[in-house]
Amino acid sequence: MKTLSERLNHALQLTGVTQSELARRIGIKQQSISQICSGKSARSRYTMQIAEALRVNAHWLATGDGEIGLGVGNVEVGPDIKGRIPLINWVQAGDWTEIAEGFAHEDAEEWREVTGKAHEGCFALRVKGDSMENPSGKKSIPEGAVIVVDPELPYSSGSLVVARLDDSKEATFKQLVIDGEQKYLKPLNPQYPAIPINGNCTIIGVVRQAIIDFW
């Protein structure tokens, strides 16, 4: 099978999952799945989520190499799904305290299933830029990664946080550093300077998880 369209249609047929059910599982519109199945979209950024939802080999689905791997490997024994949370933009994140209670389903860019300690009170953001990408450190979050943010989790020095400076409409993603009475928002990338914060910043939430999609 040479195309993503052929492989996805084959996987849907074998698993008995409909396009609408697959779209619901990964929190996107059915139209997006339909475009892949019809061949209108030769690639998809949702390939990893589709593979997880169908319990097939993600590498096979993306490239055609290897075996389909129905219900095997880490897909079969993956962590329990705890709920679905909205992937929002950085302006929405900056106003999350005000908009969270009345947030409408269609206001999200997409809805993502979450695992582990995340819960339905969390939200997700797609990382922009390379300020949190550390070329030499163990902790590094690249551009394009999806972070799961928990507004209810207490923060401390060293926490990765989403915050909004008083003079900005957008939220920002940094590491919180507390040194005595001084507080800073510190990028993990040493090429960027730390930002002093002392009463001019709101911590919106603590990052629980980072998810990296390879396709």
Curated annotation (Swiss-Prot):
<dbReference type="InterPro" id="IPR036286">
    <property type="entry name" value="LexA/Signal_pep-like_sf"/>
</dbReference>
<feature type="DNA-binding region" description="H-T-H motif">
    <location>
        <begin position="19"/>
        <end position="38"/>
    </location>
</feature>
<dbReference type="Pfam" id="PF01381">
    <property type="entry name" value="HTH_3"/>
</dbReference>
<dbReference type="InterPro" id="IPR001387">
    <property type="entry name" value="Cro/C1-type_HTH"/>
</dbReference>
<keyword id="KW-0678">Repressor</keyword>
<dbReference type="Pfam" id="PF00717">
    <property type="entry name" value="Peptidase_S24"/>
</dbReference>
<keyword id="KW-0805">Transcription regulation</keyword>
<dbReference type="InterPro" id="IPR050077">
    <property type="entry name" value="LexA_repressor"/>
</dbReference>
<dbReference type="GO" id="GO:0003677">
    <property type="term" value="F:DNA binding"/>
</dbReference>
<dbReference type="InterPro" id="IPR015927">
    <property type="entry name" value="Peptidase_S24_S26A/B/C"/>
</dbReference>
<keyword id="KW-0804">Transcription</keyword>
<dbReference type="InterPro" id="IPR039418">
    <property type="entry name" value="LexA-like"/>
</dbReference>
<keyword id="KW-0238">DNA-binding</keyword>
<feature type="domain" description="HTH cro/C1-type">
    <location>
        <begin position="8"/>
        <end position="61"/>
    </location>
</feature>
<protein>
    <recommendedName>
        <fullName>HTH-type transcriptional regulator for conjugative element R391</fullName>
    </recommendedName>
</protein>
<dbReference type="InterPro" id="IPR010982">
    <property type="entry name" value="Lambda_DNA-bd_dom_sf"/>
</dbReference>
<comment type="function">
    <text>May control the expression of the integrase and inhibit excision of the mobile element R391, and regulate the expression of other genes as well.</text>
</comment>
